[in-house]
């Protein structure tokens, strides 16, 4: 919880929510992209992508999922298992999974940390396109200055304290 202030997402003060409501909020409104992908190895790409939606007791929007897979360039891999994919394809599947529930916010923890520089640029471009296309806020954690400079806004944090915040080029 924040030391001061409030956090609003979709008009709701999320820290005024009770624990159960906050859990539901996280599941429905926040997509997570992990550095290590965290794909389930025995599930196909498609099954991994729709898993969070189905765990929420909902039916996946197949047309929307296909659109995401097309946008990320992995639709032809939807029946493959994660072990049959390159690192970049696995990261794209992880991004697709984060997008499938149509979250308001994507939290990306070093999404290019395990990728080569060419694949990293592809993934960053896809995140930007996805954020614009699906109207999402993307919060990305990175230690890479080049990647940070691609953001619209940069917040530098050290030891849990904000050192600086502002528009790209001004921080």
Residue ranges and their predicted role:
Residues 1-157:
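ABC family nucleotide-binding domain
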Residues 161-171:
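Conserved beta-strand-loop-alpha-helix hinge in the C-terminal portion
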């Amino acid at each position: 919880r924040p030391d001061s202030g409030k956090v609003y997402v979709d008009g709701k003060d999320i820290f005024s929510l009770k624990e159960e409501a906050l859990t539901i909020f996280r599941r429905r409104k926040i997509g997570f992209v992990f550095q290590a992908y965290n794909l389930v190895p025995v599930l196909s790409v498609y099954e991994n992508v729709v898993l969070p939606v189905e765990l929420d007791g909902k039916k996946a929007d197949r047309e929307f999922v296909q659109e995401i897979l097309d946008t990320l360039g992995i639709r032809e891999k939807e029946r493959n298992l994660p072990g049959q994919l390159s690192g970049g394809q696995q990261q794209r599947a992880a991004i697709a999974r984060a997008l499938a529930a149509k979250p308001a916010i994507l939290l990306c923890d070093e999404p290019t940390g395990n990728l080569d520089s060419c694949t990293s640029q592809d993934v960053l471009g896809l995140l930007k396109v996805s954020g614009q296309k699906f109207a999402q806020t993307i919060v990305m954690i990175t230690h890479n200055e080049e990647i940070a400079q691609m953001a619209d806004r940069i917040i530098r944090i050290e030891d849990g304290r904000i050192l600086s915040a502002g528009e790209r080029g001004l921080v």
